[in-house]
Amino acid sequence: MSDASAGGWADRDSYLVSTDWLGEHLDDPKIRILDCRMYFDGRLGIDAYNQGHIPGADFINWGTELATKENPVAFKMARSEQMKRVMEAHGVGDDTLLVAYDEEGGHHAARVWLAMLVHGHEAGFRILEGGLTKWQQEGRPISTAPAEARTVTFTPLAGPADVLVTAEHVLSAANDTNAVVVDVRRLTEYTGEEVRAVRGGRVPGSVRVFWQDLLHWDTDRTFKSPQEIRALLAAAGVTPDRRAITYCQGAVRAAHTALVLKMLGYENVEVYDGSWEEWGSRPDLPIATG
């Protein structure tokens, strides 16, 4: 019996590495570590990086570097030319294993995963489970030294065509019993009490699965057991037989939940790239509140 059929992970090792593993591979020249920390309270990720990071890590401001400049939606996915330029600037080449971390359980690192997936390099990417939170709790080394420069070539490839979806696709899926639209935001965002676009609310028919509930958020921010996560998802109607479309405010938290679904073996997983920032700002699209 497979782990997935027994309620376990279908494919955890293709997405995560442990702090033990990274600790043993810090000097591996084939690995590039990226610090993906970002804050929405006035702090800057680069300042946190300069104060201390995992040895050898480089800092990526993914919110600007991996977002297209041609779209008003904040984090709309970068195109291939931009992806190539950014990855090469950070020393990530075609043969590199990129290990990304943050201090929010992989929340921000997952957006980098989504970029690597879209541009055909998912196999060369892992998230550090527990991130800097677990790393520091274990008393592992911290450095203030900048990352060593590397000359590499990154070649964007054609990733899966159906990963990022449009508002029109989501609207159609909301009325499809074989699909489920998954809102991973806070309850106040879901109900419309907290307004972060022109309008507050949610996609009609969407179900809510709060992304932090998939993690041991109050301790080391590693993932809960697959059995716990499967039960939480099933209670919301997010089952493997249905196509799942995740969204949040800017497709960052949504990327994190999509990654979890992939680890569990869900075969049809999509991310609404525009998310609520787009949906809530388009008067032609319906909303639900309360």
Please annotate each region the language model reported.
Residues 2-12, 74-173, 193-194, 253-275:
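Thiolate-centered catalytic microenvironments shared by cysteine-dependent enzyme domains
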Residues 33, 100, 127, 181-183, ...:
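Structural beta-sheet core signal
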Residues 68, 102, 150, 212, ...:
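Amphipathic, positively biased hydrophobic alpha-helical segments used for protein targeting
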